[in-house]
Amino acid sequence: MLQLNYSGFTLETGTDEAGRGCLAGPVTAAAVILPSVFENNILNDSKQLSEKARALLKPIIEEQALCFSVTHLFPDEIDEINILNASMKGMQECILKLKHIPEYIIVDGNRSLNAKLGLKNTFGKQFSKEEIELLKSIPNQSIIKGDAKFLSIAAASILAKTYRDEYMDQIHEEFPMYNWKQNKGYPTKEHREAIKKYGTTKYHRMSFRLLPDQLELDFFE
C-alpha cells in the first residue's frame, strides 16, 4: 500500500512527469499536495493503471487535493534544453504554480528537483530571481519509483498522464495520420512508419533520433 507522507510535514508536495519518451507532443508535469487524511485503494503509479482507472481518479484527486498544478513544456523548449532538463523544469514550474508554498517536496526519479535550476532558454517560462530562491529554499528528496511508493507522487503521475493524453487527443484531430489518439506520441511502429511516410510536424521533437533499426529515420537530416 502506498504511503501518504515521507517527510512528516503537512504541506508535502509530490511531483512527477509524463511523456518523456515520446517523439511528439509536450512533456507534462504535475504537482499535488494531498490532505493529511487521504485514502484511496485504487491510486497507484499511472503506468500500472488502466485508462479507465486514471479517468476515474483524476476528478477525485482534483477535488480532494489541498492544491495541484499541471504544466506542459512543448517541443521547441524540449529541443532547446533537452528532455531531461525540460522534465525537471516542468516540475519546478508546477511547484511555483501551487496555491500553497510546500514545506517539503518529493520527486519521482533519481535527480534533485533543483538540478539545472534557472536554466536560460529562449522558449517557455523564465524564472525570476525570487522564484529561483523560493525553489532553493524548499527541501526536496528524489525517490526512485516514487510513484509506486507515495500517494502524492502517484496522484501527480495520474494528473500529468491524463492532462497530456487529453492534449494529444486534441492535436490528433489536426494530424490524424499519426494516430496520436492511440499512441499518444510514443514511438510505436505505426507512429514511426507515419513519420517516414508523411514527415514531421510542428508537434514533433526534432532533437529525438530514431535508431537505424527504427526505420532509419534521422531528424537531423
Curated annotation (Swiss-Prot):
**What cellular-component terms does GO give this entry?**
cytoplasm; ribonuclease H2 complex
Indicate where this protein resides in the cell: Cytoplasm
Explain the purpose of this protein: Endonuclease that specifically degrades the RNA of RNA-DNA hybrids.
Per its UniProt record, what HAMAP family does this chain match? RNase_HII_B
Q: Which GO terms describe its biological process?
A: DNA replication, removal of RNA primer; mismatch repair
What InterPro entries does the record tag this protein with? RNase_HII (IPR022898), RNase_HII/HIII (IPR001352), RNase_HII/HIII_dom (IPR024567), RNaseH-like_sf (IPR012337), RNaseH_sf (IPR036397)
Q: What family does this belong to? A: Belongs to the RNase HII family.
Obligatory cofactor(s): Mn(2+); Mg(2+)
Query: Keywords on this record?
Result: Cytoplasm, Endonuclease, Hydrolase, Manganese, Metal-binding, Nuclease
Name of the featured protein? Ribonuclease HII
The primary location reported for this protein is: cytoplasm
Residues annotated as domain RNase H type-2 = 10-220
As one GO molecular function, the record gives:
RNA binding
Gene3D superfamilies (UniProt xref): Ribonuclease H-like superfamily/Ribonuclease H (3.30.420.10)
Catalytic reaction equation(s): Endonucleolytic cleavage to 5'-phosphomonoester
In which residues is a divalent metal cation bound?
D16, E17, D108
Hydrolase found in the keyword field? yes
Question: CDD domains from the xrefs?
Answer: RNase_HII_bacteria_HII_like
PROSITE patterns on file: RNASE_H_2
Q: Where does the record place a coiled coil?
A: none
**Which Pfam families is this protein grouped with?**
RNase_HII (PF01351)
> Where is the organism placed in the taxonomic lineage, from the top?
Bacteria, Pseudomonadati, Bacteroidota, Flavobacteriia, Flavobacteriales
Provide the leader sequence positions: none
How many cofactor units bind, and how? Manganese or magnesium. Binds 1 divalent metal ion per monomer in the absence of substrate. May bind a second metal ion after substrate binding.
